[in-house]
């Protein structure tokens, strides 16, 4: 299949609200020749990443918008514009190949429209973009509501935050310290000709200079290393679990933090890992098996403790709460398209329900680490403030360290262009059963 057509099919599913990019793209990649998969992914992710800007430009170029039934043609136009603006593909090839996809979609009528619009974009692109970019939403590549929320939360960091959201994310590894230390693995990478550096904050983290197929990584299949962003790697260290403890990892999929907990503390009594659906636990099982680790996996709503908790208290709980994922937009750019303003309050409510439900399962003297990959205060510091206000037996513990920014409650990491994702942590101790 033509890579532009495959990217178009995936993006159209996202634009229509039928799927996420991570769900829609893999089936399309299977239809593309291996040599074209990188281009397919670049076009789909790139068009989603810059959709607010590309959409604003398309609105200038089109006499009238496409009908809802022609979302695929709309997606094709965005992919064509992305090629002209953001890639080194020769314009004649970008336009010709993109226009030709209309026949494959059995919409030959669209060829003339696509050809005219893309050729005008090629001729007048700079002038039109100067007009389009007067709108900060287009210039910074974020929907208006999201840009407003980010500006309200992070006025001084707004431009850098948007730049990080629009950047290609780095590939970061987590060395399994059961098999050796980071420095030794860095030496192996150097010997294999793979450029990399030690992460700044995670003692197990390595950031690659350029993404690699995991099959090229020494010892990946044997469980010596995993792929995990540096910000997510901080969870295991901050939880400070000890030998003999029983640990709960709530909302555990895809299992990176579950595995890291077991790698850093091999003598835990048990790790119970809960996620909502059995299908989400498939990846967790695969990761545990590859790494040679064991955990008790439970498919259940973590809030419904009566259905899955055996009554034995946990000494440590990691609550990696469902969130807006606004700290990982660069990895999932379709978040810009899928998220709605009302989602933030709904997610904050869900997070509060999870905190309230899981707190009784924690032993007095035990610690709960609350984590999200969001940069929205309503889901982070505000959620913790509300929980502390209604929970007399909860006290906040300090999170010392050089990473992130101290907030009224917890610490916030914002995504960095050449570094970690956006993440939030807060640490609570149970001082009484109230």
UniProtKB/Swiss-Prot annotation:
InterPro entries per the record?
MeTrfase_RsmB-F_NOP2_cat, MeTrfase_RsmB-F_NOP2_dom, NusB-like_sf, NusB_RsmB_TIM44, RCMT, rRNA_ssu_MeTfrase_B, RsmB-like_ferredoxin, RsmB/NOL1/NOP2-like_CS
- GO cellular-component term (any): cytosol
Q: Identify the enzyme class.
A: transferase
Supply the alphabetized keyword list.
Cytoplasm, Methyltransferase, Ribosome biogenesis, RNA-binding, rRNA processing, S-adenosyl-L-methionine, Transferase
Q: Does the keyword Plastid apply?
A: no
Q: What is its main location?
A: cytoplasm
- BP-aspect Gene Ontology terms: regulation of DNA-templated transcription; rRNA base methylation
- Write one Pfam family the protein is assigned to: Methyltr_RsmB-F
* UniProt binding sites for S-adenosyl-L-methionine: 251-257, 275, 301, 320
Q: Indicate yes or no for the key word Nucleotide-binding.
A: no
Q: Which superkingdom heads the taxonomic lineage of this protein's source?
A: Bacteria
Q: What is its EC number?
A: 2.1.1.176
Question: CDD domains from the entry?
Answer: AdoMet_MTases (cd02440)
Active site residues per record: 373
Location in the cell reads: Cytoplasm
* Enzymatic reactions: cytidine(967) in 16S rRNA + S-adenosyl-L-methionine = 5-methylcytidine(967) in 16S rRNA + S-adenosyl-L-homocysteine + H(+)
- GO function terms (MF aspect): RNA binding; rRNA (cytosine-C5-)-methyltransferase activity
Indicate the family of this protein: Belongs to the class I-like SAM-binding methyltransferase superfamily. RsmB/NOP family.
Question: What's this protein's function?
Answer: Specifically methylates the cytosine at position 967 (m5C967) of 16S rRNA.
Protein name as annotated: Ribosomal RNA small subunit methyltransferase B
């Amino acid at each position: 299949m033509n890579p532009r057509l495959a990217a178009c099919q995936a993006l159209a599913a996202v634009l229509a609200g039928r799927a996420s990019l991570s769900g829609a793209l893999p089936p399309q990649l299977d239809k593309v020749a291996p040599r074209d998969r990188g281009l397919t992914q670049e076009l789909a992710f790139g068009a989603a990443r810059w959709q607010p800007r590309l959409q604003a430009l398309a609105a200038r170029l089109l006499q009238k918008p496409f009908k809802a039934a022609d979302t695929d043609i709309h997606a094709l136009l965005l992919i064509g514009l992305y090629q002209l603006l953001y890639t080194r593909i020769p314009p004649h090839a970008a336009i010709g190949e993109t226009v030709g996809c209309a026949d494959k979609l059995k919409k030959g009528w669209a060829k003339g429209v696509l050809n005219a619009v893309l050729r005008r974009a090629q001729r007048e692109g700079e002038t039109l973009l100067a007009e389009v970019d007067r709108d900060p939403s287009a210039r910074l590549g974020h929907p208006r509501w999201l840009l407003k929320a980010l500006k309200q939360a992070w006025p001084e960091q707004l431009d850098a935050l948007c730049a990080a959201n629009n950047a290609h994310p780095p590939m970061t590894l987590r060395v399994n310290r059961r098999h050796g230390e980071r420095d030794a693995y860095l030496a192996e990478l150097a010997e294999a000709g793979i450029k990399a550096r030690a992460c700044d904050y995670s003692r197990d983290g390595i950031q690659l200079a350029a993404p690699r197929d995991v099959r090229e990584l020494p010892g990946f299949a044997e469980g010596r290393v995993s792929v995990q962003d540096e910000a997510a790697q901080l969870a295991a260290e901050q939880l400070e679990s000890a030998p003999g403890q029983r640990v709960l990892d709530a909302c555990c999929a895809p299992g990176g933090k579950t595995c890291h907990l077991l790698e850093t503390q091999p003598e835990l009594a048990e790790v119970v890992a809960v996620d909502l659906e059995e299908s989400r636990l498939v990846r967790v099982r695969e990761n545990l098996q590859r790494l040679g680790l064991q955990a008790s996996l439970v498919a259940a709503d973590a809030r419904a403790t009566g259905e899955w908790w055996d009554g034995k208290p946990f000494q440590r709980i990691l609550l990696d709460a469902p969130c807006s994922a606004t700290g990982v937009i660069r990895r999932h750019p379709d978040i810009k398209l899928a998220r709605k303003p009302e989602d933030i309050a709904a997610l904050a409510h869900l997070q509060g329900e999870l905190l309230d439900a899981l707190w009784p399962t924690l032993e007095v003297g035990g610690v709960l680490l609350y984590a999200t990959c969001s940069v929205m205060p309503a889901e982070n510091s505000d959620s913790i403030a509300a929980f502390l206000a209604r929970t007399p037996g909860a006290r906040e513990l300090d999170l010392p360290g050089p990473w992130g920014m101290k907030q009224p409650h917890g610490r916030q990491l914002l995504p960095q262009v050449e570094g970690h994702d956006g993440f939030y942590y807060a640490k609570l101790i149970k001082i009484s059963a109230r």
